[in-house]
């Protein structure tokens, strides 16, 4: 209805503009579509525009002057009356498709602009009115381009306690670029729209969900606690599950569902596990309540989850991302090591346990890998965990190869009044010795950030077997630390044999330093000959590797397939609420 209404107004505008151009000021060349038809009095328009801008607040004045002073205060929209309606139509068409990006068209206020511009008479212009129309159109255009290029929300404002990646914002260079030439409007509108593969994949998913939003399906009844539907069994919910999977295409449609899927058969299991892989659910041979909860989620809800993650993809860090970088999706508890757009490594991670120990969203440069690190225990762990443990397990400190210091002098654990420690009184430092039992494992990855968060190995590998891995105090434990360390080393040209040999020897020294066998002939020969091989304590990374700890509940997998995961930190709701109320 809105689109039809806007089309009707635009038809009227087009007629008015055409009539004004044909009759105004005797422009005989107007029949030639290449000719330019100017406003009857450009000087009067310029003055009206200056007056209108002067009435705005300081921030808006600054932006408008950045736009119009380089143009000599001439119109961006009405500089050529032959093309004015065409440009407005082009802008309106783009706005009408904003739901393809998860943004409501109503946010831009285009309907109000069209209503206002439909009353313009360009034969005898009311220049203050024309100046107002100019700015209204400019506001819509700027809102669209800046939102698509940089996002419609500032995540640091939206998540003040969780998000600490400063993102890019529109600057004067951006303003100049989108207003540099009014004849290239379509180019600027297109350029503002993200085009990377992940964004386009999520757009396609959004489109599918838009088509399914009105689909109604029978909810699958929740099972009693500790109950599941096992493969090969008959259950009343099995045909209901089958119908739900047919809607989203994991299962081919059949009319006689009740008879074909009376039993939880292999075909249904295969389709169900495709669904579970998409939603990062545990893949097994039974149906439990977590799977049922995901199947029962309505398509409207899923639509807004995708829309929220499209917005996240529009947020770009202010600082440059190195070509080789590490991306941790805290939501999915997964790390990807990337070179450009190519994923070279994927591994599981353990992230902070909500709500008290959430891993913050951060940007930093990894500058070193520490081998066989010691662990200085955070105060919060000393006060809230170790002090309590020591009251009933006095050997805990010595058994875990920890030392206690006060004023840099080592003290015995029994000398510490553990029960008295609090946020007001905690003068002790607890350090765990390096080695295989150290909580940081054998490798620690330091990157610049204000929270002393780092990536590290662990002495407890069992956590990586768990589906849910929100278990740490905020730092990120990595499943394959040695592979990550080798990825972060300085790149070497494979055609340079000498450099490749140096790199291989460095990798061998890292292996040897953390207690693993050497693999190069040079390394093995040195050990066989009894030569001393110096163990490394740290490896400096130059020029450094970008680390991004980010949060995405909808993303693409290694093969480009769209996946979802549980919103463990409950960060979707604020963003979705903002998108729904964006006006």
Model-identified regions with their sequence ranges:
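Bacterial N-terminal signal peptides that target proteins for export
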Residues: 1-9
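Well-ordered beta-sheet/strand-loop patches within structured domains
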Residues: 2, 20-65, 69-70, 142, ...
